[in-house]
């Protein structure tokens, strides 16, 4: 296979056996595509800003004399780029300008005559922009908008599963959920009447809604029931017979026709009887007159002579009524067909409980329910009902909702219609009744066909629409005020409500979250997170088990493993590796199509609904050479159930083994051997790994490390192929290949690297180049490594030599024993960057000042500040040191006569100000790596600010000049080639100044044209450079837009180096976490026969009960990988010839049954040398999830590395030199240092702040709080009878205010007595009892 330039530097041996059909898609596409859809101009107006504008505009005035129409919109250019926004603390956004047209109609002329048209572009606030990595910069911090999983709009049929009523009767209900608008619920009550609710209010009989639609009782019965006709013939009552309806009934009379008795009285009618009746074609049978009594009439029967009603629709028929009918001359009678089995009398019963009789009374009833207490008028009632479900402004099912609705009730037409109509409501009621009758199934609301994803774009669009609707009201008011002759669109629109709605969404919505930026993986997973919480979603408290559980439709869509532990479990999920959203927002997953029993490489994306119809084989099904299934019976899924299916029945096959799990879970090698609970912890803990000082790739990986590193955007990736022209720590310059050039550009790509920047989690973001000048690179190659990446692969931790054995109790209960060598080699040293800021405000007493002249502070404390009072860059500071000197004016105090005298003598004025300097927090010590000063417009900049400004200008100038020189060089090189082609010699060119080359004239017209073109480009380049520099200069020198009352802000960045120490939390990738208990000297650690000590000792008892065996396999494979690295190292040291090295490498890569084909002979000698050099530390291997290295391969690899096949070595005790009594499992495990550092947690309280009401000490490190002495601790002291200790705890150590101060005084005086008083919380209790109206006083006897 062809390796890219960076890949062949270190080829990972792959143990996977399944061929890769589909590469993992771009990991951030769910965010980027959604936002792209939001801001791109969509001519159809289906989604995005365009859709929002079209749904609100045109806005008409109330009187219809004028309207404001929307024409188009455009987004301007952002003022600052992403980095500048982060530094300045502003939002990265584009201004939105909308072209609107105000049309005024002529009142006097016929309708629609236009009197005046004005068009204008109006500013409508700022729209935050997504960065290329899928984040938003809001007020200078990077945020992510998490996608939401919510119930899809449409209609859902459900039941209460027998929980509502005490009898355990199952009550069915239907709910129509629109995208926006009122919910409509239909439900049965225990008496089997059908009711309707609107927006979950009081229930009404369901027939009311049909009456409100203008239906009469007879029409309603006609819709919901089949009819039975009775006829009077020759004094006998005949019944029309549909034999099928008799099934299961017991005959109450002989069923006979033409003298033949088919069913005797008292017998049950069976299928055989029915077949006979059908065969003989019996259509009418004679029935006794009593049979009709109690049946229900289907329509009104009127006596035509007198005009009186004999029987109304839905009335039970009596013998008397029957006699009246025959007297009035009716020969035929229609009754409703009902039975107890599958034609229940539900609607007929419901009509009986319905008090309304006509449309108006039904509308009034609905009005009373929606607006209780308001007097209903006919117009109000009609317009309310009309606007509830039938007005496009108030109600919208959305495309998705309509699609789901139609597929549920089986409707073909009305595809574009967002509102409901009569047919919809009737069909839903019909389906609900048929489900109650036992036909059809209820829906499963946790099925992913009924839950859809709302991503950034859609949520932003909804917020934007909310803002527009607020504006719409104001515009309507203004349009109706009249006098529009000199009004422009701009005067009508106030952009505040729009920008407020957008700002609120991006700044404080529950789904707009502070990005988790611990490492590249945590960034990627945060952007791929799917939450069921948030506005319009669930709440933690109300979500039950079913919602949180893994559903069969999660397969390949949502990860069953990666979800938080704790109250959010199952509500926050992660997207599976290959999943994507379709146009409706449903999750799809790819499958390989099987055609005529042969698995093809064609891939179809199926949603959860489509997937139900197919039989889908697993990715590890055995295939023949031709691509057919090797086994007769194949393990496959159908409708979510796994089972064995004949190979001819299989329609699809999974594309990859890690299709089921998320990216974080796919990074765990041997995941298939881990218990699910531990795998969950492993996936979650990888996200908390802190980037180490030197990243080290995992020896045992899964092969997708490269995808994560590249897609996360922390590395610098080549946009186009070319040759590296120059590299230094902060930038890489690439000369682009000829074939990838855009005509007329200079063909130079410049990559500026990020150096030592603070992340959201205070870890350090730093990019290091991993290429050398002159190296060829292709598009997509990694040029520079970011945090936690190594040669373009994700590298979250370090490979540590591990032994599984107990060691003097230091690894009791998951503790970890670490060798001192790990600390010496800085294996787990991390850099943390903190931002400390100092704000100078304008106070009532005068402005605060940033200065080095601070009262009552010695020289030593000021030694690290410059003359402006700001710390130097590079200063090493510790807790309590001053970083920025600041003084605040304080109010005039009354002076004693003595002080006045001293003032008069010494002129001491310093006491007017107090010292409010920014100091280093107590527990922190580090190095100042950067200082930034922001000065308000119009405030004079201090010396330091000017210095920083000069430095920034110099940097910018240097950057741009270098860029210009490189581009100029490229352009002049092309000029040179043109001139040489035109007959100039090298010597002649050398004698002319380079700038003058462009002014030469050539005989050849074509070449002359080219030269002139190049000259034009040169001028453009120069002008462009000047413009860029001017813009940059303006940005750097202009004042900053600071909050009101703020004059200056100084931000100081401290870099803190944290070595690993006891109390830090570490973990492997299999959920095996622990805390470091001791750092042991190297000489005391167990060592092997070669004298090599282990780095870490883990407790073997942590494995069996937790069932994460993956870690053991990883350790064995790690040992083999390292052993092979050692052999290669040995060969290099012995300077063996390349042929032997090639042969050995080929042997290694061919080991095992693998899909990977590495042909070492294709690599050049130089490539082989580089490869061997990079493999000396160990051969990196990949064991893909569910397709990992088998035991045989691990053993073969151990043998190839001349190691025991058991993976166990004899170890010797470092203290005594004696061998341990049995061989020990030793190997290499990839260990992570998690962001739970003891430095951030350790804390001790001295006298500190107290809570205001209870006067008890606060809790927590942030508040400098104490430990709570709670109820149970009090019991413990009571049990010991330690009365005085208890008294001390409850009084002077807690909330006895006078006792505390006395105690302090006593200690100072050396008198160690204690006088407890009344605890403040007792007073609080008294006050609370008094607030209940009971007075309690302590009476002194």
Swiss-Prot record:
Enzyme Commission number, as recorded: 2.7.7.6
Disulfide bonds: none
Repressor recorded as keyword: no
GO molecular function per UniProt: DNA binding; DNA-directed RNA polymerase activity; ribonucleoside binding
CDD domains referenced in this protein's UniProt entry, alphabetically: RNA_pol_B_RPB2
A cellular-component GO term for this protein: DNA-directed RNA polymerase complex
UniProtKB keywords: DNA-directed RNA polymerase, Nucleotidyltransferase, Transcription, Transferase
GO biological process, one term: DNA-templated transcription
InterPro entries named among the record's database cross-references: DNA-dir_RNA_pol_bsu_ext_1_sf, DNA-dir_RNA_pol_bsu_external_1, DNA-dir_RNA_pol_su2, DNA-dir_RNAP_su2_dom, DNA-dir_RNAP_su2_hyb_sf, RNA_pol_bsu_bac, RNA_pol_bsu_CS, RNA_pol_bsu_protrusion
Chemical reaction(s) catalysed: RNA(n) + a ribonucleoside 5'-triphosphate = RNA(n+1) + diphosphate
Record flagged with keyword Nucleotidyltransferase: yes
Complexes and interactors: The RNAP catalytic core consists of 2 alpha, 1 beta, 1 beta' and 1 omega subunit. When a sigma factor is associated with the core the holoenzyme is formed, which can initiate transcription.
HAMAP family tied to this protein: RNApol_bact_RpoB
Family: Belongs to the RNA polymerase beta chain family.
NCBIfam families per record: PRK00405.1, rpoB
Function summary: DNA-dependent RNA polymerase catalyzes the transcription of DNA into RNA using the four ribonucleoside triphosphates as substrates.
Protein name: DNA-directed RNA polymerase subunit beta
Taxonomic path: Bacteria, Pseudomonadati, Pseudomonadota, Gammaproteobacteria, Vibrionales
Gene: rpoB
């Amino acid at each position: 296979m062809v390796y890219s330039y960076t890949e062949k530097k270190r080829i990972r041996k792959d143990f996977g056996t399944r061929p890769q059909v589909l590469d993992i898609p771009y990991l951030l596409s769910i965010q980027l595509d959604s936002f792209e859809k939001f801001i791109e101009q969509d001519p159809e107006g289906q989604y995005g800003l365009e859709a929002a504008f079209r749904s609100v505009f045109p806005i008409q005035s109330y009187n219809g004399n004028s309207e404001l129409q929307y024409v188009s919109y455009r987004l301007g250019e952002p003022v600052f780029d992403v980095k500048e926004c982060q530094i300045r603390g502003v939002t990265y956004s584009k201004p939105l300008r909308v072209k609107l047209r105000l049309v005024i109609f002529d009142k006097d002329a016929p309708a629609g005559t236009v009197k005046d048209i004005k068009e204008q572009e109006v500013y409508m606030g700022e729209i935050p922009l997504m960065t290329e990595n899928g984040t938003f910069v809001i007020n200078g911090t990077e945020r992510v908008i998490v996608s939401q999983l919510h119930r899809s709009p449409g209609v859902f049929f459900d039941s209460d599963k027998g929980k509502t009523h005490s009898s355990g009767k199952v009550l069915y209900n239907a709910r129509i959920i629109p995208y926006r608008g009122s919910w409509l619920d239909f439900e049965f009550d225990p008496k089997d009447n059908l009711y309707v609710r609107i927006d979950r209010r009081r229930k009404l009989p369901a027939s009311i809604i049909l009456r409100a639609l203008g239906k009469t009782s007879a029409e309603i019965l006609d819709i919901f029931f089949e009819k039975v006709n009775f006829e009077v013939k020759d004094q006998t009552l005949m019944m029309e017979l549909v034999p099928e309806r008799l099934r299961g009934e017991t005959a109450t009379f002989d069923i006979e026709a033409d003298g033949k008795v088919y069913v005797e009285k008292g017998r049950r009618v069976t299928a055989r009887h029915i077949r006979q009746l059908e065969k003989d074609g019996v259509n009418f049978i004679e029935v006794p007159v009593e049979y009709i009594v109690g049946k229900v009439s289907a329509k009104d029967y009127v006596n035509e002579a007198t005009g009186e009603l004999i029987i109304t629709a839905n009335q039970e028929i009596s013998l008397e009524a029957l006699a009246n009918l025959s007297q009035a001359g009716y020969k035929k009678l229609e009754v409703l067909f009902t039975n107890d089995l599958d034609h229940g009398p539900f609607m007929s019963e419901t009509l009986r409980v319905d008090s309304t009789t006509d449309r108006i009374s039904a509308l009034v009833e609905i009005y009373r329910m929606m607006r209780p207490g308001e007097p209903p008028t006919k117009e109000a009632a009609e317009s309310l009902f009309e606007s509830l479900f039938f007005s496009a402004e108030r109600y919208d099912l959305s495309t998705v909702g309509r699609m789901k609705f139609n597929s549920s009730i089986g409707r073909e037409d009305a595809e574009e219609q967002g509102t409901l109509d009569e047919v919809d409501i009737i069909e839903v009621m019909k389906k609900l009744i048929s489900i109650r009758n036992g036909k059809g199934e209820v829906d499963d609301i946790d099925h992913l066909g009924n839950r859809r994803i709302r991503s950034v774009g859609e949520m932003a669009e909804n917020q934007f629409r909310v803002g527009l609707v607020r504006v719409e009201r104001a515009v309507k008011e203004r349009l109706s005020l009249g006098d529009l002759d000199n009004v422009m669109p701009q005067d009508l629109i106030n952009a505040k409500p729009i920008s407020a709605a957008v700002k609120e969404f991006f700044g404080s919505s529950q789904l707009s979250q502070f990005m988790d930026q611990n490492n590249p993986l945590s960034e990627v997973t945060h952007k791929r997170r799917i939450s069921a919480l948030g506005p319009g979603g669930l709440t933690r408290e109300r979500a039950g088990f079913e919602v949180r559980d893994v559903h069969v439709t999660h397969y390949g869509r949502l990860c069953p493993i990666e979800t938080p532990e704790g109250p959010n479990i199952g509500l926050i999920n992660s997207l599976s590796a290959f999943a994507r959203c379709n146009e409706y927002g449903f999750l799809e997953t790819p499958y390989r199509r099987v055609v005529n029993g042969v698995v093809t490489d064609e891939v179809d994306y199926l949603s959860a609904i489509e997937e139900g119809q197919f039989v889908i084989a697993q990715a590890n099904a055995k295939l023949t050479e031709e691509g057919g299934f090797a086994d007769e019976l194949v393990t496959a899924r159908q409708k979510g159930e796994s089972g064995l299916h004949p190979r001819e029945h299989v329609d699809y096959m999974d594309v990859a083994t890690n299709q089921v799990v998320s990216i974080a879970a796919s990074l765990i090698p041997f995941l298939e051997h881990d218990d699910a609970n531990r795998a969950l912890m492993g996936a979650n803990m990888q996200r908390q790994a802190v980037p180490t000082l030197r990243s080290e790739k995992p020896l045992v990986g899964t092969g997708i490390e490269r995808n994560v590193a590249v897609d996360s955007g922390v590395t610098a990736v080549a946009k186009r192929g070319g040759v590296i022209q120059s590299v230094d720590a902060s930038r890489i310059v690439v000369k682009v290949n000829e074939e990838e050039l855009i005509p007329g550009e200079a063909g130079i790509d410049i990559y500026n690297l990020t150096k030592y920047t603070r992340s959201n989690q205070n870890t350090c973001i730093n990019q290091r180049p991993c290429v050398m000048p002159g190296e060829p690179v292709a598009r997509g190659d990694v040029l520079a490594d970011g945090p936690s990446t190594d040669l373009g692969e994700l590298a979250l931790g370090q490979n540590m030599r591990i032994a599984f054995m107990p060691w003097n109790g230091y690894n009791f209960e998951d503790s970890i024993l670490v060798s001192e060598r790990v600390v010496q080699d800085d294996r787990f040293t991390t850099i943390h960057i903190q931002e400390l800021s100092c704000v100078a405000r304008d106070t009532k007493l005068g402005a605060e000042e940033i200065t080095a002249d601070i009262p009552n502070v010695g020289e030593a404390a000021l030694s690290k500040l410059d003359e402006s009072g700001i710390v130097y860059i590079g200063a090493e500071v510790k807790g309590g040191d001053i970083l920025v000197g600041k003084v605040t004016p304080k109010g005039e105090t009354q002076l004693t006569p003595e002080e006045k005298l001293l003032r008069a003598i010494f002129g001491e004025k310093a006491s007017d100000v107090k010292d409010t300097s920014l100091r280093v927090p107590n527990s922190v010590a580090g190095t100042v790596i950067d200082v930034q000063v922001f000065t308000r417009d119009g405030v004079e900049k201090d010396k330091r600010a000017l210095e920083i400004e000069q430095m920034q200008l110099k940097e910018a100038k240097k950057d741009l000049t270098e860029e210009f020189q490189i581009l100029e060089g490229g352009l002049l090189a092309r000029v040179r080639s043109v001139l040489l082609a035109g007959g100039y010699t090298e010597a002649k060119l050398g004698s002319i100044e380079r700038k003058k080359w462009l002014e030469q004239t050539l005989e050849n017209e074509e070449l002359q044209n080219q030269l002139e073109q190049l000259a034009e480009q040169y001028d453009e380049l120069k002008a462009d450079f000047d413009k860029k520099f001017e813009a940059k200069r303006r940005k750097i020198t202009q004042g900053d837009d600071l909050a009101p009352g703020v004059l200056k802000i100084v931000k100081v960045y401290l870099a803190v180096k944290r070595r690993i120490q006891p109390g830090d939390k570490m973990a492997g990738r299999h959920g095996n976490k622990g805390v470091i208990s001791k750092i042991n000297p190297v000489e005391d650690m167990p060592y092997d026969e070669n004298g090599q000590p282990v780095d870490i000792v883990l407790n073997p008892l942590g494995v069996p009960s937790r069932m994460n065996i993956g870690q053991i396999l990883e350790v064995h494979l790690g040992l083999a990988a390292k052993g092979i690295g050692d052999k290669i190292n040995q060969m290099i040291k012995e300077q063996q010839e390349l042929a032997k090295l090639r042969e050995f490498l080929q042997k290694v890569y061919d080991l095992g049954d693998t899909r990977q084909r590495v042909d070492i002979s294709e690599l050049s000698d130089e490539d082989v040398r580089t490869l061997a050099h990079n493999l000396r530390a160990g051969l990196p291997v990949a064991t893909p999830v569910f397709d990992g290295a088998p035991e045989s391969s691990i053993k073969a690899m151990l043998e190839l590395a001349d190691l025991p096949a058991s993976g166990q070595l004899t170890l010797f005790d470092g203290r005594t030199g004696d061998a341990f009594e049995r061989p020990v499992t030793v190997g290499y495990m990839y260990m992570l240092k998690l962001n739970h550092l003891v430095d951030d947690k350790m804390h001790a309280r001295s006298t500190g702040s107290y809570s205001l009401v209870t006067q008890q000490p606060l809790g927590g490190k942030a508040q400098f709080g104490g430990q709570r002495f709670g109820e149970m601790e009090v019991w413990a002291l009571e049990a010991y009878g330690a009365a005085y200790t208890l008294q001390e705890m409850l009084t002077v150590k807690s909330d006895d205010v006078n006792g505390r101060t006395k105690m302090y005084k006593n200690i100072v005086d050396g008198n160690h007595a204690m006088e407890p008083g009344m605890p403040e919380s007792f007073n609080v209790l008294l006050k609370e009892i008094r607030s209940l109206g009971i007075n309690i006083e302590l009476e002194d006897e």
